[in-house]
Amino acid sequence: MEGFRQEGQALIFEQNHETVRLEPWGGDSLRVRASAAATLRDDLPGALLAPAATSAQITIEATGASIRNGALLAQVSPTGRIRYLNALSGLELLAEEEHIQPHGWPGPRSYQQALGGLYHLEVRFQPNEHEHFYGLGQQTHGLLDHKGCVIELLHRNTQCTIPFVISSRGYGFLWHNPAVGRVQLGYDRTLWVAEAAAQVDYWITVGETTAQIVENYVDATGHAPMLPDWAAGFWQCKLRYSSQEELLSVAREYKQRGLPLSVIVIDYYHWSLQGDWHFDYEKWPDPAGMIRELEEMGVKVMVSIWPTVNPLSQNSPSCSGAGCWSARSTAAMPCTCVTWTTARKARYR
């Protein structure tokens, strides 16, 4: 059945084989899911916690529909275009692109078939001239404001992407798709892309301050535990310490000068062969004694363990037998992870 309907606290829109679901998800927040499949899925991995019970105000009329949760209002046109407003001030926060027919424009949401029953997904929003975007994890371009940038939604060495952005217009936006993709924060449009995903899934919140937006975000995704004091201190790392004696000499110098040192990091090539996951005992003859001396100086030790394996490593046969090598395949293959348990057996402590 096409058109609008209310389902509990959710607003549902169906048209042209697309289903869109808007529902309250935490204070002043909405979760939006959309799919070209017959039904929306609830079994997909993600970052959002189950929300506390929230009462939404839903209105359905001939001219469209709306759903309000606290200070966040979403208005949906008869064609399915969504606008988000601050319900207290009336400010338009974010609006999807218009449907332009019949000129071949894809509209605000598009679905292109991919392998495995998934879709290449795109969601398009209109730009705001003086809007600024912050967040998105750890990027390497050196910019505070991401406006005008194209950001990969994937991890690389030195790049840790979190698909959550805070806008200067007073909203936060989480792209809730565990898929490789990108976001284009352009001057002509804002475009979110998932290369292969089951459905569109995002979460939006509004706040009077950045702190309130972040508070809504952590309420929705989970609060991190409080860090111990040493974790917030000074960390010393070098590429690389070649021996136990070299590392201890650095820590002793800090101690002699009265400089506070919280953590010292033992990075790569402290092993004999890559994948052995234990120290090279010729250069690191007494790891346990080293750690005791460091802890007596108030210094914690972090050891970098790499998941790559030399074919000559003592762990190579067991990894091969367990099917642990990654390979390009269109089929889902079982994989057993042995790195952590093997490292523990090597007694990194």
State what each model feature region is.
Residues 1-231, 237-239, 243-252, 263-269, ...:
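N-terminal accessory segment at the very beginning of proteins
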Residues 53-54, 282-284, 330, 342:
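Short capping/connector residues at structural and topological boundaries
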Residues 184, 242-243, 274-275, 312-315:
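Short, solvent-exposed polar/charged micro-motifs at secondary-structure junctions
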Residues 250-257, 275-296, 314-315, 333:
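Catalytic cores of extracellular degradative/oxidative enzymes
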Residues 259-261:
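A structural motif
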Residues 307-349:
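Active-site-adjacent "subsite" loops/lids of carbohydrate-active enzymes
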